Swiss-Prot record:
The keyword Disulfide bond does not apply. Belongs to the eukaryotic ribosomal protein eL34 family. This is Large ribosomal subunit protein eL34. GO terms for biological process: translation. It comes from the Eukaryota. Keywords: Ribonucleoprotein, Ribosomal protein. InterPro entries: Ribosomal_eL34, Ribosomal_eL34_C_sf, Ribosomal_eL34_CS. One of its GO terms (molecular function) is structural constituent of ribosome. GO terms for cellular component: ribonucleoprotein complex; ribosome.
Amino acid sequence: MVQRLTYRRRHSYATKSNQHRVVKTPGGKLVYQTTKKRASGPKCPVTGKRIQGIPHLRPTEYKRSRLSRNRRTVNRAYGGVLSGGAVRERIIRAFLVEEQKIVKKVLKIQKTKEKQAAKN
């Protein structure tokens, strides 16, 4: 006859957060073993892609004691938060904005010089 199994925790519904597997103990008994949810890993908030170089863990396992800093991040600006493509885009955009400011400034100076020349 098949051995009946009962959950070992109070949560009694077969939901995604209460997944179990049947394991045979050395004593020959069948028991439920709670399985952990599969981790999807960190995503870039801009592109939505997975951030490469960071292990896929559950959110609590990224804490200081469980994972060292060099495993939690990537060695660049916004490392471990934004993907490489998003960082590259931000750098280029910032550079172009600064260039535009300089161009505006130069045009303004040229205009004032032309006005001065027209007056004289």
